[in-house]
């Protein structure tokens, strides 16, 4: 018997998930100050397309007492540092291949039109995405619920069939509030495991584990200690009909 995978739609953030960047620039603007103005309401308006690039840099300069030319240079340096995580993107492609093309991949990012144009010029595998949703195009940004609803409506999906991956907890929380499955991108290994859990067939995954552990199907305590006993192996034998190279414990009386 086989069960259907729980989810067939993945939505990824771009920055700090599929792309990395450095806040260290050639200017006098410190990484701390750079991150502060990137989180400002001015920058949020810029990301939604309500401010031009020049106006954004000017207003940021006024608010944070910075030279607009320095702001521009700092952003240019940050753009230059932007690099795709090819290994993780390859992993997504692998999931897509394993699903025989049934897995739909999207991106959803708070990003200005100029910054997105720079990102698209990076040597990344953009073909994995069915569509990329940007705050600049939508006029909305995460964690505003209207942005999530806009995306779900556009891809014609049930929220429960979607896995949303983002590095910011508040963005994931907003997705979960609409019924999506959410993963906080904090540890690559853990995120990979979680994605496989959501998109792979549970029976196939279980059988693959039994094959991998053949001959080593011992019980284990919560402290990581192996317990040599026959009950678990007999239970697996009864349930699957497969011996999995078991080695029974010989009990002498």
Segments (PLM) and residue ranges:
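Asp-based, Mg2+/Mn2+-dependent phosphohydrolase catalytic module
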Residues: 1-12, 112-113, 117-205
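Short, acidic loop-to-helix structural element flanking the phosphoryl-transfer center
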Residues: 6-9, 70-106, 145, 188
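Generic structural signal for small/hydrophobic residues in well-ordered secondary structure
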Residues: 13-16, 49, 95, 107, ...
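Short, basic/glycine-rich phosphate-binding loops at helix/coil junctions
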Residues: 37-39, 59-74, 130-132
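Hydrophobic alpha-helical core bundles mediating ligand binding, dimerization, or RNAP-core interactions
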Residues: 56-61, 75-79, 115-119
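Flexible, small-residue-rich N-terminal segments that precede or flank a structured functional core
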Residues: 203-252
